[in-house]
Structures are given as structure tokens and as C-alpha cells.
């Protein structure tokens, strides 16, 4: 028996808020991503990997399960009286950049182990899109081993930029912006290494096999992305530029 299980359950919260009365040159209320040394925005990386032995004749049961449940909430909120005297743009911004990866698979091919794989990928702006595909196969002869891999990704991402009330007066432009850039991958492989070689080829020699193996690969992805930019009713906005 060779079984591997990896589970991540996480919550990431980022809040930037201003309350009360303030007078300044310009204001930037931002719940967003830090920058690297070159000034480029970074991204959150959330990764779960589970690797087990292959399901083959000399392994009775081999399985890998990777479960990735992650919630991200970025909020930029203004509620008060703000006056910006500079012509430079003032803004309220919530922005999320993230890459979510879930992988489950066997550590190596064993003689006679057929393979199956299942993967789902998605990219989202304010909403998420995903696609799923899967296959499994087995051989036939003397002994039988069972190998299975399962990958589950549940990702809920929100970015809220909001002016909840008060009076906003700016000499320049005023913007309320919400952005989500989300890349998601759920990759599952049974019987073969979850990491292929540089050419994406398997090195398993399946000719003249003497054993049988039953492999299954299942991937499930549930992704929700919601980006909201709002100026609440009752809020007064007086801008010298564009809104």
C-alpha cells in the first residue's frame, strides 16, 4: 500500500480602509500586490502537490489525493470626507494576482502500469472559466494492482473596491477599480509520474507487459471570482477631472 494525501485549507485577507475627514494632495487606497525589485507586480502562489507510488502489480493499492481549498478576499474601502488638492489621480483599488496549482500523481512508472490522466485549467478576469478532461486505461494479463489519483481545487476570490459614504472632492481624476487576474491548474495523473520529462514523454516500456493495472484519475475544479467596484448611493463625489 502506498498512499499520499496533501490538504491545504487557507484564507487570505487584505484590507485597506480610510475613515473620517482628511485633506491631502492626493490619496491612494489600495489593497493589492507588492512589487519586486524591478517594479513588477507579484502574484500569490498557492500550490498543493501529492505524490504516491504507482499502481502496479507489486503494489496492492496506491493512491494520491491533493485537496486545495483557498479563499482570497481583498478589500479597499473609503467612508468619510476626503479632499485631494493635487491634480494627480486619486483612487480606491482592490487587485488580486494569483496562481493556484493542485497536482496529484504517481512517483514513477512500474512495469505494466497503464496510465490515466485528468486535468483542468482556468484563467479568469472578474469571473473564472474552467475546462475538464479525463481518461483512464488498464492492461491485461496475470497480476492486478490498483492505482488512483484525485485532485480537488475549490477557489473563491473576491476583490471589492468601495466608496461606502461621505464626500469626496478631488482636483484631478478619481477612480474606483477592482481587478482579479487568476490562473488555475488542477492536474491529476495515475500510473505515471505527475511530472513528465522535458519533451512531455513517458519513459515506461509497455511492450510485452506481464502484469495488469487499473488506474483512475479524477480532477474537480470549483472556481468563483467576483470583482466589484462601487460608489454607494448617498455619496457625494466632486472631481476636477474624470470619474
Where do the language-model regions lie?
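Low-complexity, glycine- and small/polar-enriched segments
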Residues: 1-243
Amino acid at each position: 500500500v502506498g498512499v499520499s494525501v496533501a490538504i491545504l485549507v487557507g484564507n487570505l485577507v487584505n484590507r485597506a480602509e480610510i475613515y473620517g475627514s482628511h485633506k491631502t494632495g492626493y490619496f491612494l487606497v489600495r489593497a493589492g500586490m507588492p512589487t519586486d525589485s524591478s517594479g513588477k507586480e507579484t502574484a500569490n502562489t498557492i500550490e498543493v502537490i501529492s505524490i504516491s507510488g504507482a499502481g502496479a502489480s507489486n503494489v496492492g493499492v496506491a493512491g494520491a489525493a491533493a485537496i486545495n481549498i483557498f479563499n482570497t478576499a481583498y478589500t479597499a474601502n473609503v467612508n468619510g470626507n476626503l479632499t485631494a488638492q493635487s491634480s494627480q489621480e486619486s483612487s480606491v483599488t482592490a487587485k488580486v494576482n494569483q496562481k493556484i496549482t493542485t497536482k496529484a500523481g504517481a512517483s514513477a512508472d512500474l512495469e505494466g502500469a497503464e496510465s490515466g490522466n485528468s486535468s483542468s485549467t482556468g484563467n479568469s478576469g472578474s469571473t473564472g472559466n474552467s475546462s475538464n478532461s479525463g481518461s483512464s486505461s488498464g492492461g491485461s494479463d496475470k497480476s492486478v494492482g490498483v492505482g488512483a489519483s484525485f485532485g480537488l481545487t475549490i477557489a473563491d476570490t473576491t476583490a471589492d473596491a468601495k466608496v461606502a459614504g461621505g464626500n469626496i472632492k478631488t482636483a484631478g481624476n478619481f477612480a474606483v477599480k477592482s481587478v482579479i487576474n487568476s490562473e488555475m491548474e488542477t492536474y491529476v495523473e495515475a500510473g505515471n509520474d505527475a511530472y513528465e520529462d522535458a519533451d512531455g514523454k513517458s519513459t515506461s516500456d509497455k511492450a510485452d507487459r506481464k502484469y495488469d493495472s487499473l488506474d483512475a484519475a479524477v480532477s474537480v475544479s470549483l472556481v468563483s471570482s467576483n470583482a466589484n467596484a462601487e460608489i454607494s448611493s448617498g455619496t457625494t463625489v466632486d472631481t476636477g477631472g474624470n470619474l
